[in-house]
């Protein structure tokens, strides 16, 4: 009779353990990427996003000290939002997610001076996250 251990031990070492290791690495990498791609969240709202739905840009010159620079206000509505949980006040189906960035432009370089995320519902103006 052929010993079962002689068959299972090489299979375990050469096939099963490497596959389990690859699956664990894949899950770890995916979790890390998802965590890095999420914006700061409040305790009541959790979501992730992929694509931009709409985009608006407002730009106007301002005087800072003696130089004239341009402040750009960008608002983006985010599509493909995946609402994991929401509060009773804002059902997940009615939530719209926006990202706003205020960018200061001068002759030397560009600086993002403020960046915020907020949510709105059809009947509300916006709630910062």
UniProtKB/Swiss-Prot annotation:
<protein>
    <recommendedName>
        <fullName>Putative uncharacterized protein YIL141W</fullName>
    </recommendedName>
</protein>
């Amino acid at each position: 009779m052929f010993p079962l251990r002689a068959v299972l031990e090489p299979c375990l070492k050469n096939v099963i353990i490497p596959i389990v290791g690859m699956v664990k690495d894949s899950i770890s990498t995916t979790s890390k990427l998802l965590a890095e791609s999420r914006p700061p969240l409040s305790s009541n709202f959790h979501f992730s996003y992929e694509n931009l739905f709409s985009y608006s840009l407002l730009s106007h010159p301002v005087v800072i000290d003696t130089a004239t620079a341009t402040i750009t206000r960008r608002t983006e509505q985010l599509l493909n939002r995946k609402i994991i949980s929401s509060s009773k006040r804002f059902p997940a189906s009615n939530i719209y997610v926006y990202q706003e960035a205020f960018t200061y432009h001068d002759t030397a370089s560009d600086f993002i001076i403020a960046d915020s995320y907020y949510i709105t519902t059809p009947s509300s103006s916006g709630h910062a996250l």
